[in-house]
């Protein structure tokens, strides 16, 4: 017999832990010493330019307390990728353990023997949905960057690797872990599981699930949170319509992979 109350408690506990970790790690993105647009402007100057001369450089306006308690050195890309992969992996293990202990049926989480649930058709639908969302997302990010308001630019720059090995780690390990865990939590558990266990419409559950999904991406700024909320609802709609966890995992991965490869890897700028 499924213990739905226990499942709900574990799911909400995992969600709370994720939001707390997201809040704590947000400082690594928002406390950057140099803004991305300033970095690009400075990189375009000659090595001997006067902006590097110490006598004319303005002194940092920091009190002793701020110097002691303020953010330390900017974390490396490898450290950030490892942190994301490990934290999401541990939370996924905790959630999967709760699902097993509560004896939640796989069908409630969008996992059945139907081809559209776990077969190649599900992969194809996920690729199609993810590509469509990724195209719109990349165009919107390009326009926002051209206007100097791209909310995700700072986060992408921190996570974008600078070596083939780093890209392999990002695309083969980190992004799949992110997509798998976040879809298991925000779509399969909070939408599918809660709908099956408590008789609530999955369309109704898609709203708070998308709000929670957006809240976990505060590092992208207010505009980024809004965009992420819309993305979350689109993925929730895909989950409800297909009743497939695999579809939304593939779609989520496609969105993230296309954005990183197109914007950071290939440096495509649709609007200059």
What residue spans do the PLM features occupy?
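Juxtamembrane helix-loop-helix connectors linking adjacent transmembrane helices
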Residues: 100-178, 191, 196
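N-terminal, membrane-interfacial amphipathic/helix-forming hydrophobic leader that caps
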Residues: 1-120, 124, 260-272
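Structural signal for membrane-spanning alpha-helices in multi-pass inner-membrane proteins
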Residues: 22, 95-100, 129, 133, ...
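Transmembrane helix-loop-helix hairpins at the membrane interface
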Residues: 13-18, 154-272
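Generic detector of short, locally flexible boundary/turn motifs and exposed helical patches
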Residues: 71-76, 139-144, 152, 156, ...
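Short helix-terminus and kink motifs of transmembrane alpha helices
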Residues: 19-31, 134-142, 187-188, 192, ...
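Hydrophobic alpha-helical segments
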Residues: 6, 84, 123, 127-129, ...
